[in-house]
Amino acid sequence: MLSNTSILPPSFFFCLVLYYGCLWYISGPRMRARGFRLPPGPPQMFLTGNLHDLSTKARTEPWLTFTAWSRAYGPVVYFRVLNQKTVLLNSGKVALDLLESRSAIYSDRPTFWMGELAGRKWSVFLISSLEPRFRLFRRLLQNGLNPRASKSYRPIQTQEAQILLQGLANSPRNFASHIRRVPQLASRLRGTRPYWIEFLPILRFVPAWFPGAGFKRTTFEIGPKLSQTEDIPPEWAQEQIATGNFIESFTSKHLLGLGDVKILNQSSPDDIKWCAGALYVGGGDTTVSALKSFVLLVALHPDIQKRAQEDIDSITPNRLPTHDDFDSLPFIRAIVKETLRWAPVAPLGIPHRVIRDDIYENYFIPKGSRVIANIWAITHAEELYPNPGAFDPSRYLPGDHKFQPDPFKFVFGFGRRVCPGAHLAEMSLFLNMASILAVFKISKDVDVNGVEIEPEIAWTTGTTRHLKPFRCQIMPRSKEHLSLLG
């Protein structure tokens, strides 16, 4: 479960485990005195809690382990690693009850110590909801990313979609690199598994030269690079504005003072930089991961691909789809939804933190607990989405089937932490998916004998997940369709 960059002395860990175990033991009477019990969960060891449960499977695909726990213990599950308390929410109802209806106390973030050491305290994704700057960030993002404001970014989205199509036409084998055109630095801070410092914050005082302190050297390396990356949007926008010939973007809009004057008067250039950097560094992950999943899914389901292309041809026979075709292509919109349901980009989201003791369904939820919504479990719940393992966009279209909720209620987060760019992401995915289907046919790869090769479905591990490299064929549907690229 834990990063093994190097090993700290066993005696050092023994002292730390003993210290945090005592903290946990002292806090126990407070919970028992209230007369409520903690949510059920796997049995714990006296000092280390559930550290032993975080096996290889829990490390690589924790959402599956947590889903199995929910089948054994119910939709609300409690576990502990040392003194770190965690509450899992494994159903849509529970997640909405707590993270939406009680968002006033469930919208904080637990301290991400690797981020703190790398100078990421003010990151939009990590900032505490108790900080005044948190509200300003939310207002800035809502000001620049609401559906009305997002219309001004359509030229940029169209330009990016055309670059993607040209890349696929020129080198279809490199489709993954054409899709991924955003930085990957932030993911290195979280790593493929948590670092010890996330469970033992006292390790932040260990000097970087100390054996086992490789995590500190990682933050010293990545922190400055992330800061440089976040300087790109404002510097680029300022250069474009100076020429007088620029496409409006989130950054240029705010640098020029467009939008809500009250919000802009309260913000500084650093505030704008942090918000723009969040979109640049992290915001693209949703689009990138979803597009990779989309390529795989349409390769595996030629019938769905054919139906989508027939719809596109009927609406845009002699041109590429645009944003204006959004309402006319409900099946493409359904493909966007089903892709994000079947393959949620962040299966566990980013943890929340409850800022005071709470009671839910007679369960005691301790102040300071991490609260994790198991988005994968929610979007694969049989009671919400019958036959959840099937990729079936028609489940969101009118028909003689049970109503199935819009997965956007879950996959973009909850409450005050809901992704403010959800609408922008949906429009970007719609445009890219529709454009790819308009021009190309995607199918399974074949071997030298012409026999189809089943693509291997494997995922990276982290806060956001991506499909590992897989093989497929991407070819123009015809010369006429290829000519749509101009």
Where are these regions (language model features)?
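N-terminal membrane-proximal hinge/A-helix region immediately C-terminal to the signal-anchor transmembrane segment
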Residues: 2-122, 132, 136, 158-163, ...
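Cytochrome P450 catalytic-domain helical core, especially the substrate-recognition surface
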Residues: 43-67, 85, 112-236, 252-256, ...
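Cytochrome P450 heme-thiolate "Cys pocket" and heme-binding signature region
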Residues: 323, 397-429, 455-461
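Central I-helix of cytochrome P450 enzymes
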Residues: 187, 222-233, 260-311, 339, ...
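Conserved cytochrome P450 K-helix/beta-meander segment immediately N-terminal to the heme-binding cysteine loop
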Residues: 357, 373-400
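Cytochrome P450 heme-binding "Cys pocket" and the immediately downstream C-terminal segment
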Residues: 302-305, 422-463, 475
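Conserved cytochrome P450 K-helix E-x-x-R motif and the immediately C-terminal K′/meander segment
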Residues: 53-67, 72-74, 202-206, 225-228, ...
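C-terminal helix/juxtamembrane-tail motif
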Residues: 1-6, 20, 465-486
